[in-house]
Swiss-Prot record:
Record GO biological process: auxin-activated signaling pathway; jasmonic acid mediated signaling pathway; protein ubiquitination; response to auxin; response to jasmonic acid; ubiquitin-dependent protein catabolic process
UniProt-recorded name of the protein: SKP1-like protein 18
InterPro entries on file: SKP1, SKP1-like, SKP1-like_dim_sf, SKP1/BTB/POZ_sf, Skp1_comp_dimer, Skp1_comp_POZ
Gene from which this protein is expressed: ASK18
Gene Ontology cellular component list: nucleus; SCF ubiquitin ligase complex
Organism name: Arabidopsis thaliana
Main subcellular location of this protein, as a coarse class: nucleus
Protein family according to the UniProt entry: Belongs to the SKP1 family.
């Protein structure tokens, strides 16, 4: 049985022909198809080819993912292992780009997973370390910072 193919074009002009089942992981494309707005090629102006190829790779692995009710624990474990390896090979900047693209594509599974990866990465980091990771300038004076620490002492594990 042959599957319908969908042609996606990235913002930098790369074309990707994927199965419709994979494309249906992206709700923006589902809505385009339902509204008959999906022409010969679907342009994705906010996603580069490099990022789109990674997202498609992830979507292909998840096209037949077991549901929450599914009893196949081995399949779930294998997919979780693949997911972990997928994220491990990416740097933080690429994960940020994937989050933005997954949000644009409305690909909830990847958006949640990539966001959780970033959350896990910054967990147990000091405010200074988080500022460095995200390139955030500290606009508090030392006095203001001390006052905030006193007001919220219960949140700090010091």
């Amino acid at each position: 049985m042959s599957s319908n193919k969908i042609l996606l074009t990235s913002s930098d002009g790369e074309s990707f022909e994927i199965d419709e089942a994979v494309a249906r992981k992206f709700l923006i494309i589902v809505h385009m198809m339902e509204d008959n707005c999906a022409g010969e090629a679907i342009p994705l102006e906010n996603v580069t080819g490099d990022i789109l190829s990674k997202i498609i790779e992830y979507a292909k692995m998840h096209v037949n993912e077991p549901s929450e009710e599914d009893e196949d624990e081995e399949a779930k474990k294998n997919l979780d292992s693949w997911d972990a390896k997928f994220m491990e090979k990416l740097d933080l900047e690429t994960i940020f780009k994937i989050i933005l693209a997954a949000n644009y594509l409305n690909f909830e599974g990847l958006l949640g997973f990539a966001s959780q990866t970033v959350a896990d990465y910054i967990k147990d980091k000091t405010p200074e370390e988080v500022r460095e990771i995200f390139n955030i300038e500290n606009d508090f004076t030392p006095e203001e910072e001390e006052e905030i620490r006193k007001e919220n002492a219960w949140t700090f594990n010091e």
